[in-house]
Amino acid sequence: MDVQYVLADLQTGPESQSSQSSIHFHDMAPFYVVSIERQHGLSGLVSIVPCSTTPTIHYDEKDKKAYQKAWSRGRRFAALFENLLNGGKMATKTSCSLQQTPYLQLRDEALIVGSPLGTPTRTREGISSFHNMEFNFPGAKPVVSSQMLHITCPGLRSEESLFDKNGGALYDSVTVLTGMCLFTRKILDESVADGFLDTRKLLDMQLTLYEVERIAGLSSAIADIAALVLSRYDGKCHKPVNIILDLPTWHYYQSVEDQLQHRGYKPCEVMDWIEAITLRSQQLAGLLKSAVLHELDRRGVSSSQRLYDIQISPGSALVDDAFRETLKYENLPCLDNILEALSGSEDGSWQQFYSLLPERDRPQSIKDLSYLFYIFEVVRPAVLAGIQSGNQQTPTQSADMDSTVSHRQQQPASSRSYTSKQNQMPRPLVISVDDPSERKLYSKAHSFFLRLPKNPIYPADPTLVQVYTTRRVFVDGNRKGERLYRNDPSPVMPELSNGKLYGDGGDAGYSKYARELQQMDFIAKLYGAECAANIQRWSKEVGLC
């Protein structure tokens, strides 16, 4: 699923020139042509073009400083990420090439994306730069995968890598996690909009454009990062590498919670509706897992080697069971019952997480809990690391540790240490891979990470690296910064736009497709025909075709 620099523009407004939406494709590669709005029609999107040794930034004059700042900050964090995954400065591109070792190279090309000034999206998300990060996997069947990524890692120091100055593993465990939504916002709303819960709309729904695009984009990025981490540890040490796929189930209950009392939905109806959502979640999780396994195998990491573990929404099972148990007895779920069920988690992660929440951040409704739970899934690996280390502190040790932590956080990770191994806090590394629209969630998770070293019971010193994939699909020229999830026309497919099929860098064979775009045509255009064929095959295996 190597990234081709093809972007899509979904036209839902008057410019579509019909009641049906249409779609344009724009080839941004190989970046040697200045890509500015008058050429591709996407507001707020600019490119950085390699020009001798200094990249040239093509920007909107009104946003000159903002775009330059976004590029500079993004480039700096991308370089830190490159150093982290390459195992430090000792692992240069040249040495890795000579040894046939996988490596990451930060290239010059970049996309800077920002919605127009004055739009809610611009206020919420600002401007981000996505840098071309080239993952190289030599071998009998070499793979070179280019990802346009935005990195945020405020807790990462310039000298930090996977190893300390003595060559020992710096982190006790590595977790790569991601998540995605189900269906589209429109489909979920329509399933509850006609005075009854229309479960059939959910059960009979084909894959949406949003779903297939997320699976294609996330799986290759996850595999690139996980495979590179595994290659660094190979032969040196064995450290747990976990991949977590977090997909919602009960979280969507808040979509109907406010309407239950007004419309008189029966608990059995609600249960059927949630079961339909759970089925979709399981199917998509299976599809995403198959895609990740395939991409890891392409990069030389076979599942038979048992070097990693893939988990699906590991913290949600207790809540799913609590919902089923309540609805089975014709009752509606309530927050107190769910919190009580969570308090019985065997690994203790929820109890520790909840105990560190300030009173103002504790949920007051199931809707609050559903959002908080996404944050919990990000924080959970770090909380578990503290619990599993078994280094429970006495109150006196905790007080002494506060001053030690304050000093440690000013030091590079390579020099961080305690006077004795026994008192050393566990250091889990968590790498999230997600859409930029979820940035607020990970910012809240990061603020929680900062509290864990001072946890009076099970302290940990975690690092969170946030990796965001670039948007591949824009809506209405990005004039309002809207997202595909809220504007996906599925199950009605958009029309291919006239005059945009050829001469835009697309495949010559694309003319064989029908005028109405299908999901796999859409993926073939963005990610390649092989990727589309694989997703179609895996979809059948999980019952989605």
Swiss-Prot record:
It catalyses: L-glutamyl-tRNA(Glu) + L-arginyl-tRNA(Arg) = cyclo(L-arginyl-L-glutamyl) + tRNA(Glu) + tRNA(Arg) + 2 H(+). Residues 390-433 are annotated as: Disordered. One of its GO terms (molecular function) is ligase activity. It comes from the Eukaryota. It is an enzyme of class 6 (ligase). Its EC number is 6.3.2.-. A motif (Conserved DDXXE motif) lies at residues 434-438. The conserved DDXXE motif is essential for catalytic activity. This is Arginine-containing cyclodipeptide synthase ateA. It comes from Aspergillus terreus.
